[in-house]
Regions:
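N-terminal accessory segment detector
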Residues: 1-94, 99-109, 144-146
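Short terminal or interdomain "cap/linker" segment that borders an active site or interface and mediates
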Residues: 85-94, 131-156
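Long, amphipathic alpha-helical coupling/dimerization segments that relay conformational signals between
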Residues: 106-136
Length: 156
């Protein structure tokens, strides 16, 4: 039996665009030596937010509908999938199969991908009319070998 991690690793390696690899690695090298980590994360958050505005999610009434809407948009553009679940006072978002994971080479940080998806999901939640003061933030920073991003949505 093939492990889930092995399948995800294969998916991520085979679905990366070779035509962008050199550009992405050069971009990562330039920004990682020219900007503080906090500013890079803010940049990726803003890019995620802007992207979410271009792939708008319609109003949903239930968590299941929201998960379906998120995944419909993400899978249509080959950006993986999310699982939403409530635990305690928070809604957690587990995202897998992001094409960003590993696409920027050794100069990048898992925080960049997490920040990007913070921006995507924050914008989508805001489009649902969420209460002010609720934020999406990375629950844990992934190890470089991790294929999932865990985000938490709740009071800031």
């Amino acid at each position: 039996m093939i492990s889930t991690d092995a399948l995800l690793e294969h998916h991520e390696k085979t679905n990366r665009s070779a035509q962008w690899e050199g550009f992405n690695q050069a971009f990562a090298s330039v920004i990682s030596t020219g900007l503080p980590s906090e500013e890079i994360c803010h940049l990726f958050f803003r890019i995620g937010s802007r992207m979410a505005q271009t792939i708008h999610v319609e109003r949903c009434d239930t968590l299941d509908e929201l998960q379906i809407a998120f995944n419909t948009r993400l899978q249509a553009i080959g950006w993986g999938f999310s699982s939403l679940y409530v635990q305690g006072e928070y809604l957690f978002i587990s995202h897998a199969c992001s094409p960003l994971e590993g696409s920027f080479g050794p100069a990048s940080s898992p925080e960049w991908t997490a920040s990007f998806f913070e921006g995507v999901h924050q914008t989508w939640f805001e489009s649902q009319g969420v209460t002010a003061g609720l934020r999406v933030c990375a629950e844990t920073m992934n190890e470089p070998s991790s294929s999932q991003i865990l985000l938490k949505f709740g009071k800031a």
